[in-house]
Amino acid sequence: MSEYQSIGVIGAGAWGTALAQTAAKAGRDVTLWSFENDVAEAVNTKHENTIYLPDVALSTAIVATTSISDLDACDAILAVAPAQHLRRVLEGFLPYARPGLPIVLCAKGIEQSSLSMMTQVLKETIPAALPAVLSGPSFAIDTAQGLPTAVTLACADETVGNALIEALGTSRFRPYLATDLIGAEIGGAVKNVLAIGCGISEGKGLGKSAHAALISRGFAEMTRLALALGAQRETLAGLCGLGDLVLTCSSPQSRNMSCGLALGRGVSLDDIMSGRRAVTEGVASAPAVVELARRHGVEMPICEAVNEILAGRASVDDAIETLLARPFTLETA
């Protein structure tokens, strides 16, 4: 039996449900907390998340609840609430979190109000928890259906990290251990903003060459910010950096890229967001990424252009022209 036999999942969106399914397939007992009654009821009665992950038959080992106190006896927690709501959700879980409880942060974003990474939010809300980060190239539907997926699980305590990998890993879901939490977090947050940019390029019909340039130059921006914050370069070259960036920037299955596609085709951001129930993390993270970069003296022109478009301060065409008018420079700059 695993050291972490009972897994609590906080957040029953598509990704939280997919991770619950993966943990159940790994033989764990899973309690899935949902903010929404209709989601919890569907998971328990139909064994399907009809709202966020329809047409996927869920394991009967997953028990959904709307009472976060039901996670008090879990051996480890996967925190999959959206980045901008994580603080409030963790504050609600604080009374039930015992010291040393591993909490794996699965949201990819930066808190807009404080510019805090998710590990910092956890440190401020549940300081006695043991933090880990799960990030990498993984669409919820692929993971839930058991298609081969590899991710990074970052944990400073390698013993705990390896135990979490044993608890969650299967032949189809393969976590790789890292100890660089900052790198894993920055990769996940910045790639969402860059994916919006790639979607805009695709929506405007700028071609595959421009798409490749955005991915590679975007990766340089991601790496510069991560290094400025103390991350290791090797982390960004792995699954949680380059791997996640390539996936998210290459498929309209990504909510961030599909948002950019619509923007590039002339749809307003308000119209895009009003038609979505699921969160598009890059929209909320863009201003935080840009401000964090400014405070650390890091140039991120692609992310800045995306943020200007999202904020309504620049049209898509003007933002593109501004990028193309930048001075020529060394590729490593």
From Swiss-Prot:
Its main location: cytoplasm. One of its GO terms (biological process) is carbohydrate metabolic process. It is an enzyme of class 1 (oxidoreductase). The keyword Lipoprotein does not apply. It holds the Pfam family NAD_Gly3P_dh_C. GO terms for molecular function: glycerol-3-phosphate dehydrogenase [NAD(P)+] activity; NAD binding. The active site is at K191. NADPH binds at W15, K108, A140, R255, V279, E281. Sn-glycerol 3-phosphate binds at K108, G136, S138, K191, D244, S254, R255, N256. It catalyses: sn-glycerol 3-phosphate + NAD(+) = dihydroxyacetone phosphate + NADH + H(+); sn-glycerol 3-phosphate + NADP(+) = dihydroxyacetone phosphate + NADPH + H(+). Keywords: Cytoplasm, Lipid biosynthesis, Lipid metabolism, NAD, NADP, Nucleotide-binding, Oxidoreductase, Phospholipid biosynthesis, Phospholipid metabolism. GO terms for cellular component: cytosol. Pathway: Membrane lipid metabolism; glycerophospholipid metabolism. It is found in: Cytoplasm. The keyword Acetylation does not apply. Its EC number is 1.1.1.94. Belongs to the NAD-dependent glycerol-3-phosphate dehydrogenase family. PANTHER family: GLYCEROL-3-PHOSPHATE DEHYDROGENASE (PTHR11728), GLYCEROL-3-PHOSPHATE DEHYDROGENASE [NAD(+)] 2, CHLOROPLASTIC (PTHR11728:SF1). Catalyzes the reduction of the glycolytic intermediate dihydroxyacetone phosphate (DHAP) to sn-glycerol 3-phosphate (G3P), the key precursor for phospholipid synthesis. HAMAP family: NAD_Glyc3P_dehydrog. NCBIfam families: PRK00094.1-2, PRK00094.1-4. This is Glycerol-3-phosphate dehydrogenase [NAD(P)+].
